[in-house]
């Protein structure tokens, strides 16, 4: 920042330094007065003038150096001068050295303030944490998805085994029910009737498919009392 300010000052000195040494003020061109006398031109300020008398003032017939800007003489409108004959390369161009110096300092301060503002806005602002880019790796994707695949496969195998066991148990139960259902009608059909006598026990054959304890099939028959007026034939002899 200090280097930039020094550079601006150096440029100003190189631009206006030699001009200030050669032409510190305006040049009053030579003129011819009313009597016809010619007066040579001079550079403002003259030896007897002050340092701020850098402006050519007066009239076309009488010219002198002064410091008042409102009294400046427009030498381009005068017709009684022979400036081109005296100095062919010099024209009547006003040079406002104080205004140029003040303007250059003002511009330098503006540039300096702008640089300070930019520095404060960019360097003193808290930096936000930069987000790292997400990198996709096939190896990490495989390592993440492989346990999930194995877990889902084991769950499917376990569910298949449980469903197979359930279906086999249901099939066995249905077969047992079917055999039990088919065995019941055979239980209702007894074998040949035993002799209707006392002291004999009835032994019913239990089918293989009927799952009932055998103690309910062997029991003695109680003797019924004879009916009055009726006689039962004895089938034991036959």
Curated annotation (Swiss-Prot):
Where would you find the membrane-spanning parts of this chain? 99-119
A Gene Ontology biological process in which this protein takes part is: negative regulation of canonical Wnt signaling pathway
**Compartments where located:** Endoplasmic reticulum membrane
Q: Mind telling me which Pfam families this protein's record contains?
A: Shisa_N (PF13908)
- Lumenal membrane side: 22-98
Topology within the bilayer: Single-pass type I membrane protein
- The signal peptide here is 1-21
GO CC, any one term: endoplasmic reticulum membrane
InterPro entries attached to this UniProt entry: Shisa (IPR026910), Shisa_N (IPR053891)
Gene deletion effect:
Mutants exhibited no phenotype in either head development or somitogenesis.
The residue ranges for the Cytoplasmic side of the membrane come to: 120-238
Q: Does the keyword Mitochondrion apply?
A: no
Q: Which domain of life, per UniProt?
A: Eukaryota
Is the keyword Hydrolase in the record?
A: no
Keywords for this protein: Developmental protein, Endoplasmic reticulum, Membrane, Signal, Transmembrane, Transmembrane helix
Protein's job: Plays an essential role in the maturation of presomitic mesoderm cells by individual attenuation of both FGF and WNT signaling.
Family statement drawn from the similarity comment of this UniProt entry: Belongs to the shisa family.
Q: What is this protein called?
A: Protein shisa-3 homolog
The root-end lineage is: Eukaryota, Metazoa, Chordata, Craniata, Vertebrata
């Amino acid at each position: 920042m200090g280097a930039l300010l020094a550079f601006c000052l150096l440029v100003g000195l190189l631009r206006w330094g030699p001009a200030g040494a050669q032409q510190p003020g305006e040049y009053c061109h030579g003129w011819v007065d009313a009597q016809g006398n010619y007066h040579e031109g001079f550079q403002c300020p003259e030896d007897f003038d002050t340092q701020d008398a850098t402006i050519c003032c007066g009239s076309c017939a009488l010219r002198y150096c002064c410091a008042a800007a409102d009294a400046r003489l427009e030498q381009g409108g005068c017709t009684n001068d022979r400036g081109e004959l005296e100095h062919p390369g010099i024209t009547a161009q006003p040079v406002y050295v104080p205004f140029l110096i003040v303007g250059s300092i003002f511009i330098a301060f503006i540039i300096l303030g702008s640089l300070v503002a930019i520095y404060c806005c960019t360097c003193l602002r808290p930096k936000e944490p930069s987000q790292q880019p997400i990198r996709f790796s096939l190896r990490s994707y495989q390592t993440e998805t492989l346990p999930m695949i194995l877990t889902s496969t084991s769950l499917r195998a376990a569910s298949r085994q449980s469903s197979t066991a359930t279906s086999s148990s249901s099939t066995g139960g249905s077969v047992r029910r079917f055999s039990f259902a088919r065995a019941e009608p055979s239980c209702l059909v007894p074998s040949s009737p035993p002799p209707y006598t006392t002291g004999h026990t009835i032994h019913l054959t239990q089918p293989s498919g009927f799952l009932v304890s055998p103690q309910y099939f062997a029991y003695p028959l109680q003797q019924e009392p004879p009916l009055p007026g009726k006689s039962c034939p004895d089938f034991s002899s036959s």
